[in-house]
């Protein structure tokens, strides 16, 4: 659910601790997205094992500078295979990164210190090394499908060390 970074939610309470994903308002749902951009990376699936591999190639709508979708409201029409996260599918998508707030909330866990709802700063996701900023090498329009295997990377499935810290360094 990557979108261009916005001001953090003006929620005074920690709604993600008291509500289920199904109970969230649209604004609360959208504010859970930390703007990391990991879900906008192209992924490959091993047909034999079902294992998902991330690449450092982004969707054609991904704005590398803003680290978000360049046409978020129309993304599904322009990119038919864009996965819209829902309360149902975040519990079953096996490729969501370990830092994904939707996944964390679905598992009853709290958000990390760098999440904009916690820090009050949309840049902490970048400071913590969680976002794809500076790591995307191309968009899908620039790489042939046959060459995507050459762009497989492991980092999107990992949580950076500084992101695991309890607070900002």
Curated annotation (Swiss-Prot):
Stored Pfam families: CxxCxxCC
Endpoints of the signal sequence: none
InterPro entries the record matches: Puta_zinc/iron-chelating_dom, UCP006173
NCBIfam families in UniProt: PRK05170.1-5, PRK05170.2-5
Family: Belongs to the UPF0260 family.
Name of protein: UPF0260 protein OCAR_6616/OCA5_c14500
């Amino acid at each position: 659910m990557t979108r261009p970074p916005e001001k953090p939610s003006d929620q005074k309470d920690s709604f993600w601790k008291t509500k289920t994903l199904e109970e969230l308002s649209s604004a609360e749902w959208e504010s859970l997205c930390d703007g990391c951009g990991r879900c906008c990376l192209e992924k490959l699936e091993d047909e034999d094992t079902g294992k998902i591999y991330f690449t450092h190639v982004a969707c054609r709508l991904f704005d590398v500078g803003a680290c978000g979708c360049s046409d978020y409201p129309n993304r599904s029409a322009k990119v038919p295979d864009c996965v819209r996260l829902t309360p149902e599918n975040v519990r079953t998508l096996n490729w969501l990164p370990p830092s994904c707030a939707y996944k964390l909330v679905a598992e009853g866990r709290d958000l990390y210190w760098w999440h904009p709802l916690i820090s009050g700063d949309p840049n902490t996701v970048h400071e913590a090394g969680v976002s794809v900023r500076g790591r995307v090498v191309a968009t899908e329009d620039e790489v042939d499908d046959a060459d995507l295997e050459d762009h497989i990377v492991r980092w999107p499935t990992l949580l950076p060390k500084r992101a695991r810290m309890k607070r900002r360094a």
